[in-house]
Amino acid sequence: MNIHEYQAKEILHKFNVPVPKGFVATSAEGVETQINQLKSDVFVVKAQIHAGGRGKAGGVKLAKSVEEAQQFVKNMLGITLVTHQTGPSGQQVRRIYIEEGSSIKKEYYLSLVVDPKLSRLVFIFSSEGGMDIEEVAKNSPTKIVKFDIDPATGFTNLDNSKLANNFNLNSEQIERITNIAKNIYDAFITTDASQIEINPLVETNSGDFVALDAKINFDDNALYRHPEIVQLRDYDEEVKEEIEASKHGLSYIKMDGNIGCMVNGAGLAMATMDIIKYYGAEPANFLDVGGGASKETVTEAFKIILSDSNVKGILVNIFGGIMRCDIIASGIVAAAKEMSIKVPLVVRLSGTNFEEGKKILEESGLNIIAADELGDAAQKIVKEVK
């Protein structure tokens, strides 16, 4: 689950990570009164969307007066911001965050993420803050250091020698960065986060370190433990089909193609999308029904797929392991009859009880196109759609 920058800063502030003072606005009303409560001559006006690249897209403005800040708020609210992370459709700006400006001496990058190879949490630190960390890693790898955390001991300390030798930091700077890192670690563990990123972490002219921007993602599987975090969810920032899918235990991601996919298992779903592209078409979605799909689940999956007007055909690709193919076939037939599916439907069943499943499809009286192999299934649906 993602949250907005202002929400991330509120959480970090509770864990004693220094952040600039600010407030969120959903309209221009009352902005002047709230700005006057900030102790600054310069204000940063930031569009709040669940995507990076806001600055380059015009979503971050520096205001040198209260009047200029008000005007920026009026100009930003309601616009559609297009960044390299939003896709061409962009995201509408419904919230603006206004905060005190900071005097910047130096920008750093600091994040805490899960490293799947090490099965540990890893801090990533760089002297090249404010930039795309992937580009820094590619072009200047020596400017990045990583510190993995032993889960048995938890956070103890950053490797001061690495910080000192790689970035020429003095003992006071290292101590302040280490304290912030410890507080980030505490926030990460306490909230069941999956990522905390501060970019940039700035050193001010007075020698303080401040989180100028913040991003926090949470582990969806742990949200049941954190109702207070669930309340931060902004459904306006999410695709409505993905929200509906999550209600039924389905993993759904909307894409730009015209062939809907219903598959069990994330790996098989990705392979299915790949082979659709291989044969010259584009998938309309990623949809994993999981290992225990029922008739009701299959029906909801069809509804979600067909809610996309771009879908011109559907490929169902099921491997019966835990899931029995005859049960899935019955669910497909029942859902197809209930919904009167008009687009071409290709079904490939393999695994447990697949022969019984194929028989159910054949005897259904519905125009369901059967396929034995994945390649065969992909070619058939591509042919039907073109």
From Swiss-Prot:
Instruction: Name the positions where ATP binds.
Output: K46, G53, R54, G55, E99, S102, E107
Tell me the cofactor note: Binds 1 Mg(2+) ion per subunit.
**Pathway annotation from the record:** Carbohydrate metabolism; tricarboxylic acid cycle; succinate from succinyl-CoA (ligase route): step 1/1
Look up the record and report any one GO term of the cellular component aspect. Answer: succinate-CoA ligase complex
| Taxonomic placement | Bacteria, Pseudomonadati, Pseudomonadota, Alphaproteobacteria, Rickettsiales
Q: Name one Pfam family in it.
A: Ligase_CoA
Q: What class of enzyme is it?
A: ligase
Q: Where does Mg(2+) bind?
A: N199, D213
Coiled-coil segments, which residues? Answer: none
What role does this protein play?
A: Succinyl-CoA synthetase functions in the citric acid cycle (TCA), coupling the hydrolysis of succinyl-CoA to the synthesis of either ATP or GTP and thus represents the only step of substrate-level phosphorylation in the TCA. The beta subunit provides nucleotide specificity of the enzyme and binds the substrate succinate, while the binding sites for coenzyme A and phosphate are found in the alpha subunit.
Keywords linked to the UniProt accession: ATP-binding, Ligase, Magnesium, Metal-binding, Nucleotide-binding, Tricarboxylic acid cycle
Provide the E.C. number(s) assigned to this enzyme.
Answer: 6.2.1.5
Chain ranges passing through the membrane: none
Q: Where does substrate bind?
A: N264, G321, I322, M323
What gene is this protein translated from? Answer: sucC
Superkingdom to which the source organism belongs? Bacteria
Q: Which family does it belong to?
A: Belongs to the succinate/malate CoA ligase beta subunit family.
Name one process (GO BP) from the record: succinyl-CoA metabolic process
- Origin species, per record, is Wolbachia pipientis subsp. Culex pipiens (strain wPip)
Q: Which residues form the ATP-grasp domain?
A: 9-244
The protein's name is: Succinate--CoA ligase [ADP-forming] subunit beta
Its assembly, as annotated, is: Heterotetramer of two alpha and two beta subunits.
